[in-house]
């Protein structure tokens, strides 16, 4: 009997200035699936002296960490492994000593990449894992360097690596561990001076969306969610968190809801750099990217991943993995878009992400049926909220889960969500339910001709009376749906012509 060939494993290791990271994935069905993530706080940059020589203690911390990584690498083909060093290993005068022993421990070569190459790889990781239309600004605050990239699609248009990071700024501007206004102001001002040479180029290029791809940004998002805020980072929120940090006199006393002990040490320095970036570049809002350097390394190795719309690739891979009827998903999505257009399109739901989320839900709403029909909506919600979905933010995944939970039968009001406004979120759900109901025979040729009109939240669905008379099940389901929506304050009437 033939034995199935397992999917190939790939490993990417990033010897960062603050942490060493290892990512192990497998390539399956045109996408990558994360198999392991290992992270150790090495704080290599903190071991640099005034002559940029690494201390023996810092090097030993790094070697000890790599001994752990080496065990996992034994099972992965050499050609599927990429190991890179970044800012601290670019700077250290005795980097050769560290790398020679590290190579022996790992059994694989370490490539110390330039700042520009690091920025390009970060952008590749973001482009393959984060959605969003138009030009994007990517910010990655590392331990000893900060990368800023402007790009569109898979092409980077501006690449910059600046010699400032959360570890080096900690040692330079918070050396006394005091969280004073003076220390914060000095750290922010110094970061702005580093940014000055690139401001003209970056503001002239411009961008449509801004994403952050670092531990600093991830920590900020975790804090904001823990404190009941949405996931979008703004300057106002950063300033609020700075005030919270300054309530502690000393760094070791820092206690902010949602901030883990592991991230606390470099939080004020990373926050200072991010405030400077927001103020210098007049950034309105930032969200967390789906990937960065390690993901970029993986996507460089996996050659046959198509450079296509990230969300389209995600949907296709999920449909394949969970055996979802993609033709029916396309039918529901097409009908949902048609109903939206009949209601006035963007004039009725004036949010650019709304139709994308509507179509995604339409294509994936049956994912839970692979587990069980009876609680299909519940299973669909759980899967969409917990799967890795490149191209979708955490808030969008949460919202998708809540609307597919309610795609049929019983209807309840949506809980608080941050992907869309309350009004838009509700309207998208109403369209999804109608599209699923009207396409229940699973063939576009058998769909009724309908006209949906909207006066604010009052919907009127008009169908051919003769068709309804011949299709009593659909008629009954539409009457029930009208009652369900109307009962929770969403008026829906069914009319015949």
Swiss-Prot record:
SUPFAM superfamilies: Actin-like ATPase domain, HD-domain/PDEase-like. Transmembrane segments: none annotated. The keyword Hydrolase applies. InterPro entries: ATPase_NBD (IPR043129), GppA/Ppx_hydrolase (IPR050273), Guo-5TP_3DP_PyrP (IPR023709), Ppx_GppA_C (IPR048950), Ppx_GppA_N (IPR003695), PyroPPase_GppA_Ppx (IPR030673). CDD domains: ASKHA_NBD_EcGppA-like (cd24117). It catalyses: guanosine 3'-diphosphate 5'-triphosphate + H2O = guanosine 3',5'-bis(diphosphate) + phosphate + H(+). GO terms for molecular function: guanosine-5'-triphosphate,3'-diphosphate diphosphatase activity. Its EC number is 3.6.1.40. GO terms for biological process: guanosine pentaphosphate catabolic process; guanosine tetraphosphate biosynthetic process; nucleobase-containing small molecule interconversion. Keywords: Hydrolase. Pathway: Purine metabolism; ppGpp biosynthesis; ppGpp from GTP: step 2/2. Catalyzes the conversion of pppGpp to ppGpp. Guanosine pentaphosphate (pppGpp) is a cytoplasmic signaling molecule which together with ppGpp controls the 'stringent response', an adaptive process that allows bacteria to respond to amino acid starvation, resulting in the coordinated regulation of numerous cellular activities. Belongs to the GppA/Ppx family. GppA subfamily. PANTHER family: EXOPOLYPHOSPHATASE (PTHR30005), RETROGRADE REGULATION PROTEIN 2 (PTHR30005:SF0). This is Guanosine-5'-triphosphate,3'-diphosphate pyrophosphatase. The lineage of its organism: Bacteria, Pseudomonadati, Pseudomonadota, Gammaproteobacteria, Vibrionales. The gene is gppA.
């Amino acid at each position: 009997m033939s034995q199935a060939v397992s999917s190939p494993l790939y490993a990417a290791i990033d010897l960062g200035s603050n942490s060493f990271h290892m990512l192990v994935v497998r390539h399956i069905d045109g996408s990558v699936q994360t198999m392991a993530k290992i992270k150790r706080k090495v704080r290599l940059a903190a071991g640099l002296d005034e002559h940029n020589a690494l201390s023996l203690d810092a090097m030993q911390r790094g070697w000890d960490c790599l001994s752990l990584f080496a065990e996992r690498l034994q099972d992965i083909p050499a050609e599927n492994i990429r190991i890179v060093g970044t800012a601290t290993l670019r700077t250290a005068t005795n980097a050769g000593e560290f790398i020679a022993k590290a190579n022996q421990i790992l059994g694989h070569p370490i490539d110390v990449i330039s700042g520009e190459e690091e920025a390009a790889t970060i952008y590749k990781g973001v482009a393959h894992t984060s959605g969003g239309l138009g030009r994007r600004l990517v910010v990655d605050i590392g331990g000893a360097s900060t990368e800023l990239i402007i790009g569109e699609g898979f092409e980077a248009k501006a690449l910059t690596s600046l010699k400032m990071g959360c570890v080096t700024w900690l040692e330079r501007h918070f050396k006394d561990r005091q969280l004073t206004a003076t220390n914060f102001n000095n750290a922010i001002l110094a970061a702005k001076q580093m940014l000055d040479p690139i401001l003209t180029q970056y503001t002239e290029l411009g961008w449509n969306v801004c994403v952050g791809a670092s531990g600093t940004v991830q920590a900020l998002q975790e804090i904001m969610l823990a404190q009941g805020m949405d996931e979008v980072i703004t300057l106002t929120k950063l300033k609020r968190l700075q005030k919270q940090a300054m309530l502690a006199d000393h760094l070791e006393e820092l206690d902010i809801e949602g901030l883990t002990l592991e991230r606390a040490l470099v939080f004020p320095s990373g926050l200072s750099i991010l405030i400077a970036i927001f103020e210098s570049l007049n950034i309105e809002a930032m969200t967390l990217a789906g990937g960065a350097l390690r993901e970029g390394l993986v996507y460089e190795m996996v050659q046959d991943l198509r450079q296509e719309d990230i969300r389209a690739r995600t949907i296709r891979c999920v449909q394949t993995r969970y055996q979802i009827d993609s033709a029916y998903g396309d039918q529901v999505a097409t009908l949902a878009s048609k109903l939206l257009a009949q209601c006035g399109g963007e004039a009725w739901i004036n949010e650019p992400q709304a139709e994308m989320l509507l179509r995604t839900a339409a294509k994936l709403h049956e994912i839970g049926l692979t587990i069980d029909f009876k609680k299909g909506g519940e299973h669909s919600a759980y899967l969409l909220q917990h799967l890795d979905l490149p191209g979708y933010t955490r808030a969008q995944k949460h919202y998708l889960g809540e609307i597919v939970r309610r795609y049929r039968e019983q209807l309840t009001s949506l809980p608080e969500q941050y992907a869309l406004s309350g009004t838009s979120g509700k309207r998208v759900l109403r369209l999804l339910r109608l599209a699923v109901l009207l396409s229940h025979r699973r063939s576009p040729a058998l769909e009724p001709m309908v006209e949906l009109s909207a006066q604010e939240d009052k919907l009127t669905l008009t169908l051919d009376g003769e068709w309804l008379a011949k299709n009593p099940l659909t008629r009954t389901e539409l009457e029930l749906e009208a009652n369900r929506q109307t009962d929770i304050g969403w008026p829906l009437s069914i009319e015949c012509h």
